[in-house]
Amino acid sequence: MDKRKIKVAILSMSSLLMISMTASAVLADIQRYFVGVDPSLISMVLTIPSLMGLVFAFASGPLSLHLPKKSLVIFGLVCGLTGGMVALLFGSLSIYVLLGCSLLLGVAQGMNSTMSMALIADYFVAEESGALMGLQSAFVNGGSMVLLFSSGMLAGVSWQLSYLVYLVFIPVIVIVMKNLPNDHPQTADQERPAEKSAKLNARVYFTALIMFLFGVFLFVFQTNVAMYVAAKGFGDASTSGLINTSMSAAGMLTGVLFGRMQRVLRQLIIPVSLVVGSLGMLSIFVIGNLPALFIGAMCCGFCLATINPAGTFVAANAVHASISSLAIAVVTASCSVGIFVSPLLSNAVANAAGGNLAVKFLWATLGLFGTAVLAVIGNAILDKKGIGGQKS
């Protein structure tokens, strides 16, 4: 077993995990194209992948106990390629075609977000596992940066052309087929008593709650940045693409440094990350100019690139190794639920404030800061009770 080849496969598939975010730069263009369509329906082009991501992120954990992870990964990648190509060729026919494509993208997002972390937990241990989770986050954001920039430039010609970036699924499928080994799930009679009795604990469920709240509040940025740029007259889809690219660039750098930050901050890494995200949202609400959007994007990128590997690492190390995939699936699915309901809640807040778009960023500021406080208090209680402590 060549671990270097496994790393190549994991990191290549990870580089596509945020490809559905390319829609964030063209939401305003899609809204102008489909005249009279409810804005909430337009936002679902971006949020439906999170809904399907929820279903398949959770389902992939139990499925991996019965099917090879390699097969699940390839299935997800093929769904992503299919969704992107259908959107490219037929997305202009109806908003519902785009929504259907978003469902397929969600399958890819949910399946492989869980599998990428589960594969790391399977083949790598202790500090090597944590460092690789950070590197995985760097590739998620690095890939996102390139994809967002490319799709933003293509969207400057036509929003439909932004879906050309989904062709990148083809080489990744080849890399995974060549480098990822076929694992063979254990049968019931192969399981040891400790594995059969293994259960999820309060640490996993609390981390899932934090990830849910994180998804609710941080995703305010992705679903509203293009609308905010258009409303303020700061530019077009290309401008939104550059802002999203800066978010991914900050996330990529953060992912590379994640291993070191985790060793220094330990359990404070999640609260600190949430506070940084809160400050980014606050800069958009208080200052509200184009530089503030870039600052906010970089703060959100730091938050995103830190929370995902940190939350996954906590969940995987809080339970018996035999159910680490299930723990990761629960945490990943919780984040997807938060992302899906985010525009519904933020739109309700904005409507209550008279349709003020900027108030969404204030709501996100308060929410992220409150979640940071909750994380500190909750983990202190769990530590005191000795529940789900991280394994060395």
Language-model-detected regions and their locations in the chain:
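Intracellular juxtamembrane helix-capping segments at the cytosolic ends
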Residues: 111-124, 306-320
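Conserved MFS/SLC helix-loop-helix module at the cytosolic interface between two early adjacent transmembrane helices
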Residues: 55-94
